[in-house]
Amino acid sequence: MSRYRGPRLRIIRRLRNLPGLTNKLVESKKNKVSGSDQSIQKKVSQYCIRLEAKQRLRFNYGLTERQLLNYVRIARCAKGSTGQILLQLLEMRLDNILFRLGVVPTIPSARQLINHRHILVNNRIVDVPSFHCKPKDIITIGAPKTYQSILSKRIESFAKDQVPEHLTLSLSEPKKPKGLVNYLINRESIGLTINELLVVEYYSRKA
């Protein structure tokens, strides 16, 4: 299954707000239940609950079905909680790190910068959005002139205290902001409201 490129509002109306996909907020359709519909509401199956959790994770981080399945398999082979390791793997992707630093509004926009070779990790160009960042990695945003004004406005509007503790944003060079990965992210700093155990359960027969 390919990566979703359709209307984003349609997704967040169905799956609720996904900060990585879009910064727009809408009321979920599930919260808009008319009086006549309340009497005919069906009990949601456990499969549907797990499927929704999986879809929230996939769309928020902009993954294909195969990519997410591969991450689940990697998490299963690692020591520790499979669900937490899965979230850690997704959060430490380069495209998500840029998003969490606040230099881009969404993960898709971070992916665009990376694909155009404007991002350096430890002074080397990295053009792979799924690149796994590690503690002590230094990310430099070498944005083109056409994007610098947008970048400066974005950074001004993004409060520095919104940057999670596992990351540090340096603005000593406004035209080339830098990010530092302090340590691996912990569960409390995950930017998405999600029950990762439901995702692991969904893939229990596939991974």
Swiss-Prot record:
Keywords (A to Z) from UniProt? Chloroplast, Plastid, Ribonucleoprotein, Ribosomal protein, RNA-binding, rRNA-binding
The UniProt entry lists the main location of this chain as plastid
GO CC terms: chloroplast; small ribosomal subunit
Q: Name one Pfam family in it.
A: Ribosomal_S4
Q: Does the keyword Nucleotide-binding apply?
A: no
Q: Which residues cross the membrane?
A: none
Location of this chain's protein in the cell: Plastid, Chloroplast
Q: Which terms under GO biological process does the entry name?
A: ribosomal small subunit biogenesis; translation
Question: Has keyword Ribonucleoprotein?
Answer: yes
Domain S4 RNA-binding, by residue range, is 92-155
Q: What Gene3D superfamilies does this protein's entry cite? A: Ribosomal Protein S4 Delta 41, Chain A, domain 1, RNA-binding S4 domain
The source's domain of life comes to Eukaryota
Q: Name one GO molecular function term.
A: structural constituent of ribosome
Which PANTHER family does this UniProt record tie to the protein? 30S 40S RIBOSOMAL PROTEIN, SMALL RIBOSOMAL SUBUNIT PROTEIN US4M
What is stated as this protein's family in its record? Belongs to the universal ribosomal protein uS4 family.
What does the record note on quaternary structure? Part of the 30S ribosomal subunit. Contacts protein S5. The interaction surface between S4 and S5 is involved in control of translational fidelity.
What is the role of the protein in this entry? One of the primary rRNA binding proteins, it binds directly to 16S rRNA where it nucleates assembly of the body of the 30S subunit. With S5 and S12 plays an important role in translational accuracy.
Output this protein's name.
Small ribosomal subunit protein uS4c
Q: Which organism is this entry from?
A: Equisetum scirpoides
Gene that this sequence comes from:
rps4
